[in-house]
Amino acid sequence: MPVKIPDHLPAAGILESENIFVMSETRAANQDIRPMKVLILNLMPNKIETETQLLRLLGNTPLQVDVDLLRIHDKESKHTSIDHMNTFYRDFEDVRHKNYDGLIITGAPLGQIDFEEVTYWDHIREIIDWSQQHVTSVLFLCWAAHAGLYHLYGLNRKILQQKRSGVFVHRRTCQHFPLLRGFDDEFFAPHSRFAEMDIEELKQHPELQVLAESDEAGAYLVLSRNNRNLFVMGHPEYQKSTLNDEYHRDLAQGLNPNVPQNYYRNDDPQADAIARWHSHGSLLVSNWLNYYVYQLTPYDLSDMTAMTPWESQ
């Protein structure tokens, strides 16, 4: 949250140059406050686990957040009871007439399947298109990030020979962006995917900005220049055990997976896993919710034209 300071205080310029969020008394006096309304499109098989992971991050912010859970209507969930889905999830027809402050679209275990071959691809496209007029900011995670970049900007992914799984070091490629406030120069984030985006294509695209990358895992944080779409190529929401669970699931299916890199102590899958990314994940979601949702969204959600983007940097 911002520090409110007197108008024209000399420290303001210094703090802003250090990427510290300050707000003048004049601006603070004109702020209206209400709960943030966030919609989560949950595409992961274990709905309850993913709900918990995302709500854990959203709940660690100082803002009050009202959450709606969204499903693909005609897609059966094999790992979550129909009672749970009918009780807690909405269909798109229930929300298409609404506006939201934020939308989170999760990853999906669709690996090497072409986007056009995904059985519910038309539903994904429809929801993404809808979000560009009805949501202040959209957070795309892992598979959803690739899908969003493909649908919105025509950028396709490259299929990897081996699944990229592990916890990798990342660095900021830009300094003075609200999303990166409080980030260390280097930080860890988990990845679990069968594909990657061409980082040079991302950097050369006039409507996109690469904010963080990894020598081992490639592009990590990509932001659209209108600040509406944030593409996160990894899984900052994962809990400590998730990569381990996925590794043993793949072993049981005879897929001969590589051991997740930089995850187990001494890279020994019989040893304990080390969670190095939780503080980063918490800060990332907090910054997104504060700077790209709360600070930009209109008080009256019926008026999405009232949104005032950050100046492109």
From Swiss-Prot:
Pathway: Amino-acid biosynthesis; L-methionine biosynthesis via de novo pathway; O-succinyl-L-homoserine from L-homoserine: step 1/1
Gene Ontology terms describing biological process: L-methionine biosynthetic process from homoserine via O-succinyl-L-homoserine and cystathionine
Site (Important for acyl-CoA specificity): 111
Binding, substrate: 163, 192, 249
PANTHER family: HOMOSERINE O-SUCCINYLTRANSFERASE
Protein family according to the UniProt entry: Belongs to the MetA family.
Protein name: Homoserine O-succinyltransferase
Gene: metAS
